[in-house]
Amino acid sequence: MPRISLSEVMTKFPLTVQAEDPVIEVQDIFEEYSIHHIPVLSEDKQVVGIVSKTDIDQLSWGISLFANPNRESYNEALMHTRRVKDIMTKNVYTLDVDDSIEDAYSVFRSEDFRAIPVLENGDLVGIVTPIDLVKPFITN
């Protein structure tokens, strides 16, 4: 079987957010684009984290445990005041665009990641998920 590089299967140039962005902006992106992970960039465009739909769900889910009649308005205020840096996963593992799908598979097996940013010369050029790794093997 020929070697398949991540450049062949990754989502190219994914949507990104910055660490200082309010969480509500990320929530809006998740809803509008039906995606589940967004790389977080610093002001100088370096990957500093990743935020997932689960991160946002956990933020609001904790509030919903309380029988508070103002829960919805509190959740709304929380989404506007919390920053991405407060909920993102830091110290994200990254892969290189020339790495193979086998390399990515090894990372997904050994770590608890559901998406990995893909870099080329230190710049974000894509994101890969476990689903992306099986695409070359699915025939129509």
Over which residues does each language-model region extend?
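A generic helix-loop boundary/linker signal
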Residues: 16, 20, 46, 74-78
